[in-house]
């Protein structure tokens, strides 16, 4: 026998069954199509960021988003491109909703396109929640300072530019450099230094924007073959996909990361490549809207737009998870003063610099440690985090790497005229590049192995020259066996 409440619920469900309500208005008032934009007139109460469904004359459906509202006019950016839109016969439906993504832990191990639609022949994702892809700003008072290290397995990153959980640190690269290989290696090897919890507490969200078919195939094959796919969510926007879709892709990735981090308690590493393609998409939309251009044609609000992406990294008070961002960008003509790396450097907390000269000398990974920097490194290393000699070893390695004067003197007067100390520096530099920086694509070194390798190199010098390391630590590690502490 059903209770009154159960009978009422059953009655309501029966009334709702097969009952279609369509309160939305459809418009056929497209005034113009300009690049990726559709301009509509006579629209009743359009809303900024509202999602618009566009039905073409052949029945094909496309999605767009309101970019600008002026009275009864609305400018809509179409994610799938405007090719084939007939001004006279296409219909536009304003949904009254912002763009949302259905998120779930089932997204791990899945591949999506740049609009968040599965492309791996798997079933649709059963959403636990629907989230606005623009995210919600984190209250600065609720932020927790990043103090624990993420281990990448690459010595030049782990020792010299250590990455904290919750940090945002970009990879500055150039066309033709192996940043894709470095990204794939980080995905395969990344983990937590101190594995207090279970291994599944760590996962990766990878978003590719504007990549070609070969690069997309490389990433998918690499992740599937090395077994990291089961802990990875992959968003792929290809070069032949609509440019406008690239504006949405990183936001979908970060919305997924926020759910996995703050609702599921996971430590999420987000890798975004290539942010230069994202900035080019911003410029294309800005040009179509006939906005006043800024430096090199990029919109004046690009700094704000990039900050809306990068600032979604971090840790939140009372939440177990964290979001760490490694955006990858290719500097046009290797110019670090270009607006994209320039503005990125202002927002983020350091950078990892991929060097063309090291790459031309067949060194992999070609990471130049001198222009590289991690501003949050000091709180993520040391006793209880990695090892107590980490900070001193890193400072000493940097100090011994500054050899511009010695190399210039060697080029002018020859090696024979150099002092014995200068010769030690040259020996150190040669072994530093061959043993420390140079590392195989499938070679993973934990931070303790990398620190031990540093001590092997520092023993080239007499103990008294290692003045960046405190005396107690220097005596223990220079003479004795390295230990984990």
From Swiss-Prot:
Gene3D superfamilies: 3.40.50.12240. One of its GO terms (cellular component) is proton-transporting V-type ATPase, V1 domain. The keyword DNA damage does not apply. One of its GO terms (biological process) is vacuolar acidification. One of its GO terms (molecular function) is ATP binding. CDD domains: ATP-synt_V_A-type_beta_C, ATP-synt_V_A-type_beta_N, V_A-ATPase_B. It holds the Pfam family ATP-synt_ab. Keywords: Hydrogen ion transport, Ion transport, Transport. The keyword Ion transport applies. Non-catalytic subunit of the peripheral V1 complex of vacuolar ATPase. V-ATPase is responsible for acidifying a variety of intracellular compartments in eukaryotic cells. V-ATPase is a heteromultimeric enzyme composed of a peripheral catalytic V1 complex (main components: subunits A, B, C, D, E, and F) attached to an integral membrane V0 proton pore complex (main component: the proteolipid protein). Belongs to the ATPase alpha/beta chains family. This is V-type proton ATPase subunit B. The lineage of its organism: Eukaryota, Discoba, Euglenozoa, Kinetoplastea, Metakinetoplastina.
